Amino acid sequence: MWTQKWHKYYTAQVDENDCGLAALNMILKYYGSDYMLAHLRQLAKTTADGTTVLGLVKAAKHLNLNAEAVRADMDALTASQLPLPVIVHVFKKNKLPHYYVVYQVTENDLIIGDPDPTVKTTKISKSQFAKEWTQIAIIIAPTVKYKPIKESRHTLIDLVPLLIKQKRLIGLIITAAAITTLISIAGAYFFQLIIDTYLPHLMTNRLSLVAIGLIVAYAFQAIINYIQSFFTIVLGQRLMIDIVLKYVHHLFDLPMNFFTTRHVGEMTSRFSDASKIIDALGSTTLTLFLDMWILLAVGLFLAYQNINLFLCSLVVVPIYISIVWLFKKTFNRLNQDTMESNAVLNSAIIESLSGIETIKSLTGEATTKKKIDTLFSDLLHKNLAYQKADQGQQAIKAATKLILTIVILWWGTFFVMRHQLSLGQLLTYNALLAYFLTPLENIINLQPKLQAARVANNRLNEVYLVESEFSKSREITALEQLNGDIEVNHVSFNYGYCSNILEDVSLTIPHHQKITIVGMSGSGKTTLAKLLVGFFEPQEQHGEIQINHHNISDISRTILRQYINYVPQEPFIFSGSVLENLLLGSRPGVTQQMIDQACSFAEIKTDIENLPQGYHTRLSESGFNLSGGQKQRLSIARALLSPAQCFIFDESTSNLDTITEHKIVSKLLFMKDKTIIFVAHRLNIASQTDKVVVLDHGKIVEQGSHRQLLNYNGYYARLIHNQE
């Protein structure tokens, strides 16, 4: 009873690392607001590891709330020294970092909101809470500027236009179903004629004629059933295109920071979420238009047969509704729980398969299998709980249906004995009763499907709410506008609310210059390179990057990446032919001669020619049939086939032998019409470029030519000395 008072403020986490965001939204609901978790995620700068306490404080302040993280103990909580509700950081079950919202403190218990949808708003004993609490609390209260805001949420109703688009197909399905229903009613009525008319009067000719007609009708019904099933499959596929492909396309349009703050399994698990939405949309459409029609048509016929038996049959309706209501909350909780467990398992499997080489080299198979076994067992356990609830509901409905059938026959027999109903009418009524109860069951069965779809739709919308990096209108939309110097002006950058990776970096890279960025691991070299190509953006009011005096925030992301080609240390090779990999992102009109030249340039042409089918040789996923050096050379050739005028090679030759590396680097340096940026540990490359930029702890400590920096005898000179 006490928990019901607070349940209206409850918010469930969508993904495993959303617990802090859900807790924050519970506080926001208490103060009259309601935000989408995707919005709060951006404000709190949530990463794949979750949300920090600092992130929650910053997000709350951004929404005009006073927020302060404090350290407290049970005495302070019990003595009401902490204003409630309050967010607390815990180690759930003494191992999982998590957040609760404490709503109320009683003599022996606390009323908490747990973002875990399997728990929700509940009581927890003070002793158990004390074991889990890290004694960190976040006190939040509105400021004078605070105004409640309730963000609109997309619901399943928003998907109705997808169904309207398929109205012709849906109309054909409904028409086919109407025809088959009429034939079924006619078939049931035939039994009444046999018993009440043909048998008593020995009407053999009429019996044969009607029987042959019904055989033809049933054959026609089979054809119509096939057509209806085919159209239903087509409807499902068209909805799949509108929902699943739309989600895939949106994923590819999202900015890079979306992928760095989420697990792959969280994204892939939403494909199965989409199938739940499609199932619900298809079922809802057919049920509303088809089953409702059948229910009405058969119901009228049954009422015509015997109104008393029909009224008896209607008793099942409130019983079915009660069954649905009893299972509603259970299905909602179990659906959310199963989807989350599936996402966690997918992430673990994908991560393990991606790192299989490391697992095998460390003989970590047993540990990995144990981890996956645990997650798989958890998913099976939660899926079993869902299936138990579903089968329990189905069993109750089946029992109700059987009991009703017996009651109808029992009561109907009395009508026959009193000559108020013929035997044929009773048998016909009983036969048609199934056609009445089946659509009624279909309507009732919508409940778990719609609940699963609602949860799945919420999960999909959390991704759709992340803005595409291509949605913003940008001024620069032509490559020709970018031919000029690259300027980095006082740029600072960090990931989340961590300390700065780059600190007040200023750098000018003249057009067609060749430079090398060097520094120890973690100095910010790769981060700077990714900022140049627009994978991440500098913090607001913390500097800017310009190309030919155009801020890169004003440059179309497609044009920016066509102008600057970033080649990472670990290039990704896609499953497909060598040629398909080379042509990915290539400039228009690439000829075989150009491909040969690029491959010769990258010292990979001979290797390709030695493959079984040359350029048409199929490569496995991630290029497992290529060496690390071959992958790097292939990626360099691929970059040379792009329209890029500037190349960033981020340790892109680290797996090459020194002779091959020297050949390729020398050729790159000879490209007078290209800007070349090397990010390197091997300082022999730095000695060949026009300029060397030295980074240390996110700051440029030195820059100049190789000779100038050696003469300066500073940080760079020490790096050279240590490498020798």
UniProtKB/Swiss-Prot annotation:
Domain ABC transporter: 486-722
Mode of membrane association: Multi-pass membrane protein
Its EC number(s): 3.4.22.-, 7.-.-.-
GO biological process: protein transport; proteolysis
CDD domains per the UniProt record, alphabetical: ABC_6TM_PCAT1_LagD_like, Peptidase_C39B
Protein role: Involved in the export process of the bacteriocin pediocin PA-1/AcH. Is also essential for pediocin production.
Family indicated by similarity: Belongs to the ABC transporter superfamily. Pediocin PA-1 exporter (TC 3.A.1.112.2) family.
Name the record gives this protein: Pediocin PA-1 transport/processing ATP-binding protein PedD
Organism: Pediococcus acidilactici
